[in-house]
Curated annotation (Swiss-Prot):
Enzyme Commission code(s) on record: 4.3.1.18
InterPro entries the record matches: D_Ser_am_lyase, Ser/Thr_Dehydratase, Ser/Thr_deHydtase_PyrdxlP-BS, TrpB-like_PALP, TrpB-like_PALP_sf
Lineage: Bacteria, Bacillati, Bacillota, Bacilli, Bacillales
Name of the encoding gene: dsdA
Species for this entry: Bacillus cereus (strain ATCC 14579 / DSM 31 / CCUG 7414 / JCM 2152 / NBRC 15305 / NCIMB 9373 / NCTC 2599 / NRRL B-3711)
Protein name: Probable D-serine dehydratase
Gene3D superfamilies documented for this protein: 3.40.50.1100
Length: 443
């Protein structure tokens, strides 16, 4: 790896990252969709396959998780307009947001209350299906609700699943695996919130805590799983299945936009702002959206100023060969879901030609935005889920990207979607504390 001095000389923005200042970065390596997709390791067929698998499991999900019954076992979240928040942002930052502002409430996804309910649950279901088909427990033509039986739970109990997590992925995988009957272990990093660990333990999940950060928890989980042939490791850093589980969100979002009569085409661009940790969730969603909307969708990743791992990896082209700690950043943030020091190389390399840019936001700003959203729209998100909220302001303010792609006029007829990644499962007293912090920082 290059010396820090050489990186600073080649990429002046590194200086601001080191100073943990908020930055906005336009990806110089973005390509036209038709060029980018040619070299992509994944394609539309892979996403369709994931979508079909989730449909096969829908009867099982509806039976085991009654809260999904109304949607027939499809795990989906609302897409809502947030006009009062839009006004508040325009006032606060003295910057008009051109176009309409919507919030995708993955914070309110059933089962585990975060975006991780998409990829995490999908990967567990895929593994369960492979085992069940292999051992003649089901055929693809069966109604998968038959998996909710003592016989199947006993069968799955011979196998184990492990994952390393800062919190939300652990919740999704822990809850789903335990329901099916698997023995499940979640390796939690130091920044994981206590309530998330408690909730997992209450579901019979084995939680192992580490003093170290996320990368260490993943490494340890992987090592232990490798030693046990009956253990399946959900690898958040390299998993194609997690990524595809997230990508399915795009076609669901397309239907919701149609219901709201929101047009997305060359004259009506779509901008999407996704909080980013190791990269799987935002990468998968952005990839799915690119498959559908091609060059008419513009995706941005949002990271905490103390954990800008994906921005650092993409900007330097070093991907997972560099961590924020390598340039002296501490990777300590209250945005626990985004507290990742080293990005996924797979996601960074896959998304590099598709991504419009990255930006960072401070913890203090996340708390202020949390309070603002609660006040204006009565929607409560966890701190990390607010990282996307400042995106529309940044894109409209630093309009170099809009000018470059001749979008300065078109953006007025466009739509901005902030991806609210988690929050509905946060205990009330914890949420009150978050709100108080936002209030103190606003006064």
């Amino acid at each position: 790896m290059k010396e820090i001095g050489a990186l600073q000389a080649e990429y002046p923005l590194v200086n601001k990252l080191i100073a943990t200042e908020e930055v906005f970065w336009i990806n110089p390596n973005i390509e036209k969709y038709e060029t980018a997709i040619k070299d992509s390791p994944l394609n539309e067929e892979n996403v369709k396959d994931a979508e079909e698998r989730l449909k096969r499991f829908a009867p099982y999900i509806a039976k085991v998780f009654p809260e999904t019954k109304g949607a027939n076992g499809i795990i989906e979240s609302p897409l809502v307009k947030i006009p009062s928040m839009k006004e508040a942002l325009e006032r606060k930052y003295e910057q008009p947001i051109l176009g309409e502002l919507l919030l995708k409430c993955d914070s309110h996804l059933p089962i585990s209350g975060s975006i991780k309910a998409r990829g995490g649950i999908y990967e567990v279901l895929k593994h369960a299906e492979q085992l069940a088909l292999q051992h003649g427990m089901v055929t693809e033509e069966d109604n998968y609700s038959v998996l909710d039986s003592d016989t199947c739970r006993e069968f799955f109990s011979k196998y184990s699943i492990a994952v390393g997590s800062t919190g939300n992925l652990g919740l999704s995988i822990g809850i789903m695996s335990a329901n099916l009957g698997f023995n499940v272990t979640v390796h939690m990093s130091a920044d994981a919130k206590e309530w998330k660990k408690d909730l997992l333990r209450s579901k019979g999940v084995n939680v192992i805590e580490y003093e170290d950060d996320y990368s260490k928890a993943v490494e340890e989980g992987r090592r232990q799983a490798d030693a046990d042939p009956s253990c399946y490791f959900v690898d958040d850093e390299n998993s194609h299945d997690l990524f595809l589980g997230y990508a399915v969100a795009a076609s669901r979002l397309q239907k919701q936009l149609e219901e709201l009569e929101v047009v997305v085409d060359e004259n009506h661009p779509l901008f999407v702002y996704l909080p980013c940790g190791v990269g799987g969730g935002p990468g998968g969603v952005a990839f799915g959206l690119k498959l559908l909307y091609k060059d008419n969708v513009h995706c941005y990743f949002a990271e905490p100023t103390h954990s800008p791992c994906m921005l650092l990896g993409l900007m330097t082209g070093l991907h997972d060969k560099i961590s924020v700690q390598d340039i002296g950043i501490d990777n300590v943030t209250d945005a626990d879901g985004l507290a990742v020091g080293r990005p996924s190389g797979f996601v960074g390399k896959t998304m590099e030609p598709f991504l419009s840019g990255n930006y960072t936001v401070s913890d203090e700003e996340l708390y202020r935005l949390l309070k603002e959203l609660a006040d204006t729209e009565n929607i409560y998100l966890e701190p990390s889920a607010l990282a996307g909220m400042i995106g529309p302001v940044k894109v409209c303010k630093e309009d170099e990207y809009l000018q470059k792609l001749q979008l300065t006029e078109k953006v007025k007829k466009g739509t901005h979607i902030v991806w609210g990644t988690g929050g509905s499962m946060v205990p009330n007293d914890t949420m009150d504390e978050y709100y108080r912090k936002g209030l103190e920082l606003t006064i």
